[in-house]
Structures are given as C-alpha cells and as structure tokens.
From Swiss-Prot:
SUPFAM superfamilies: Triosephosphate isomerase (TIM). It comes from Corynebacterium glutamicum (strain R). It is found in: Cytoplasm. The active site is at residues 100, 172. Pathway: Carbohydrate biosynthesis; gluconeogenesis; Carbohydrate degradation; glycolysis; D-glyceraldehyde 3-phosphate from glycerone phosphate: step 1/1. GO terms for molecular function: triose-phosphate isomerase activity. The gene is tpiA. It catalyses: D-glyceraldehyde 3-phosphate = dihydroxyacetone phosphate. Keywords: Cytoplasm, Gluconeogenesis, Glycolysis, Isomerase. This is Triosephosphate isomerase. GO terms for cellular component: cytosol. Involved in the gluconeogenesis. Catalyzes stereospecifically the conversion of dihydroxyacetone phosphate (DHAP) to D-glyceraldehyde-3-phosphate (G3P). Belongs to the triosephosphate isomerase family. Its EC number is 5.3.1.1.
C-alpha cells in the first residue's frame, strides 16, 4: 500500500493569530497545487491561532490542514486551563499532537496519559500524532529500538485496530529536537521499521501497512527527501523550519519529490 507522506509543522509556542494567517497564506500559495496531490501538508498551531487558521483555510479553500499541539484527556468539567477534543473538533481540527517530548519533560506526561489523550482525540474524529523517542543516554547505550517500541506500546494502550488506523506516530529522538543534530536516514528507518512491526503485532498487517510514521527532530528542507525516501518513514513532524511559510513550502516540495 502506498502511503501518502504527511508533512506536519509543529509551531510550538510561536506566531500569534495574525502571524498565523500570513504564514499559512504563504505556505499555501508557495506550494503548487500538484504537490498537494503527492503530500499532505498540515500545521499544528497554538490554541489561540486555531480559529484564525480555520477561517482562512475554509474561506479560501486551501489544501493545508490544521490541528492543535495538545488536548485534555477529559471531555469537560472543572479542569482549569484545559481544552477538550470536542472543542477542537468544533473548530474542524484534523490533527492533535500528543506526547511530544516537551510535554513529557516539562509537564511530566506519562505514556498512560498520552494514550488517554489519543483516545479522547479519536473519540471526537481527530487523528492524534503520537510522539515517541529516546533520550541521548538510551541512544548511546544502544537500547533505543527496544525503548521506543515499549514507549510506543504504552502510548497506544487501549486503542483498537480501527483507532490505530486513524493514528499517526512521530518518532522524535529527544537528542535531535531543536539541537541541530539530525538522526541519519538509516537511524530513522531502523526505529520506524520497528514501530511498524509493533503495529503488525497490535493490529495486523493491513493497519500497519496503512499507518503513517513520521520522523521529527531538526528536519530541514535539505534533509527531508532522504529521510522520507526511507521505506518506513512517511513524512516529517517539523519544528522551527515550519515557522516560515515559504521555507516550509520548499521543505514540503522536497518531500513530494520522493513521494
């Protein structure tokens, strides 16, 4: 089964709602329409930007999709500061990032919480982008494959085959996020192949063949084609390189060249 690559920008805590409009406009207009037939292009934006991006995308019928960077595991109630999946669904979010290493580190998010957030998203028709990845000491010890497979298993706990079919996994080695260090294409392939093997175990060959596994961690326009060209890497979760619309369009075009 041919998997259409997904290039998803993770803006993190950058760009206000006015800047968001300009960035998405530049992205959409800088990427020729035929490229959208080869790759899916998305932005995951701060909560305060979502409504502005939705209005632009739907009003101008842009091919870019959008989503959020986190979601509550709860549906509603006395959870100050939280945003529910149903609220995101009302804004027509297609995606939500869960379990990013920055959430795991700064907010002490566990694999169990990540799985609950993924479940909440799926229950509201939103595809979670479930992030996993090893720290430097695990990589240096040579146990990174086992570590990431087990982390992925726990972060997907409770999801059935249908839910897994609507899930995206992003492999982001923690030591490569925002550091300028990039895992080699072979490194990315090694871990993504192992993740796909886990999905075979959990949900069968058909789901595993259709599920998209992204690489994240200092992805740049110059490196994306080689990484996405690997047999088990189906796109990228892009941080800093997604903050400039035209530069992100170039990155997506380079990914499309190997699709």
């Amino acid at each position: 089964m041919a998997r259409k690559p997904l290039i998803a920008g993770n803006w993190k805590m950058n760009l206000d709602h006015q800047q968001a409009i300009g960035t998405v406009q530049k992205l959409a207009f800088a990427l020729p329409k035929e490229y959208f037939e080869k790759v899916d292009v998305a932005v995951t934006v701060p909560f305060t930007d979502i409504r502005s991006v939705q209005t632009l995308v739907e009003g101008d019928k842009l091919e870019v999709t959008f989503g959020a960077q986190d979601v509550s595991q709860h549906e509603s109630g006395a959870y100050t500061g939280e945003v529910s999946a149903s609220m995101l669904a009302k804004l027509n979010c297609s995606w939500v990032v869960v379990g990013h290493s920055e959430r795991r580190e700064y907010h002490n998010e566990s694999d169990e919480l990540v799985a609950a957030k993924a479940k909440a998203a799926l229950s509201n028709g939103i595809s979670p982008i479930v992030c996993v990845g090893e720290p430097l000491e695990i990589r240096e010890a040579g146990t990174h494959v086992e570590y990431v497979v087990e982390q992925t298993r726990k972060s997907l706990a409770g999801l059935d085959a249908t839910e897994l079919a609507n899930t995206v996994i992003a492999y982001e080695p923690v030591w490569a996020i925002g550091t300028g260090k990039v895992a080699s294409a072979a490194d990315a392939q090694e871990v993504c192949k192992a993740i796909r093997g886990l999905i075979v175990e959990l949900a069968g060959d058909e789901v595993a063949e259709g599920l998209r596994i992204l690489y994240g961690g200092s992805v740049k326009a110059e490196t994306v084609a080689e990484i996405v060209g690997q047999p088990d890497v189906d796109g990228g979760l892009v941080g800093g390189a997604s903050l400039d619309g035209e530069a992100f369009a170039k990155l997506a075009a380079n990914a499309a060249s190997v699709a």
